[in-house]
């Protein structure tokens, strides 16, 4: 099996786990536009992005087909994940007045990121979009531990996902047949389970 085939399979595994977790979370009713409601959006969209990534790596990239459209679709969905995570952070940790400001920022950020994805063919755009939001979410969870609104489980999940991102960004390819993308997916599965 090729490295791209293995990467596609690890993407499918990640998507399966994330969809399972999103389904479990969807079982209990949530107030519309609450932190839990937005976080369910994080999981659902992350599963969609992983599934699109599986199709991209397993079929488009391995066949040498043009990848612009599918890659843009994947990266725009990841922008939606970032939007939902920013709104999760706002709803969980900030007052309603500040939440409105976060909504405006999140909409503008999503629009700018979508334009950047369409114009700049680089995964760096995705990283620069989600990294500040992940850091904010991490910081607010750490600060919130004292008052009980932060979560050690979320902190652990974010740190594991950050390690996965570092592995991918570094291009660490020492676990053949897993390349850096495959290792990223496998480590991300563990991180998502903690979330």
Residue ranges of model-derived segments:
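Polytopic alpha-helical membrane-helix bundles and their juxtamembrane interface segments
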Residues: 1-44, 54-74, 82-195
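Conserved phosphate-interacting/catalytic interface
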Residues: 51
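Extended substrate/RNA-proximal surfaces in nucleic-acid metabolism proteins
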Residues: 78
